[in-house]
């Protein structure tokens, strides 16, 4: 499966700032059923541009999540993912499962907003989904992303996709 080897991602604007839902939780930014059509359209557009998947970005320059996946980054201080709440990000069961297991293995985990350049300089980046698994991101907008095969295996193990 191509996602197992890695994916090329295209950044697409979600059209809102990273804190757009902080003062307006009634807008239901993190409700999956309301965003399904947009997610399908984003994937279709990304694929029409030669990418395998999309990563939504905020208008203030932060990477948020994939249309059907959570974003995880490995850096010197552990694993990062995008915070939920003000960002309108859906809570990812797969990311939560991985972060719990990583913490039990002594790996630091945190939520934080991440700029495009930080992700390109990270040790690795992945899109995680309970259906599609753990997909290493090979490139974002045509820029290569460093690969960490050991961490890919660990993420897949923590998520329950490998032993």
Explain the meaning of each model-derived region.
Residues 1-163:
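Helix-start/capping segments and mature chain N-termini
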């Amino acid at each position: 499966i191509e996602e197992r080897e890695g994916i090329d991602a295209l950044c697409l604007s979600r059209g809102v700032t990273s804190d757009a839902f902080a003062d307006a939780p009634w807008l239901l930014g993190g409700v999956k059923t309301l965003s399904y059509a947009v997610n399908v359209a984003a994937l279709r557009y990304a694929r029409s541009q030669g990418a395998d998947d999309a990563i939504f970005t905020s208008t203030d320059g932060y990477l948020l999540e994939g249309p059907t996946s959570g974003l995880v980054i490995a850096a010197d201080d552990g694993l990062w993912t995008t915070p939920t709440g003000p960002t309108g990000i859906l809570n990812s069961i797969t990311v939560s499962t991985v972060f719990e297991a990583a913490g039990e293995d002594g790996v630091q985990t945190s939520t934080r907003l991440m700029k495009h350049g930080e992700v390109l300089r990270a040790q690795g980046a992945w899109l995680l989904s309970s259906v599609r698994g753990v997909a290493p991101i090979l490139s974002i907008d045509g820029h290569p992303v460093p690969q960490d095969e050991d961490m890919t295996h660990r993420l897949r193990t923590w998520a329950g996709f490998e032993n």
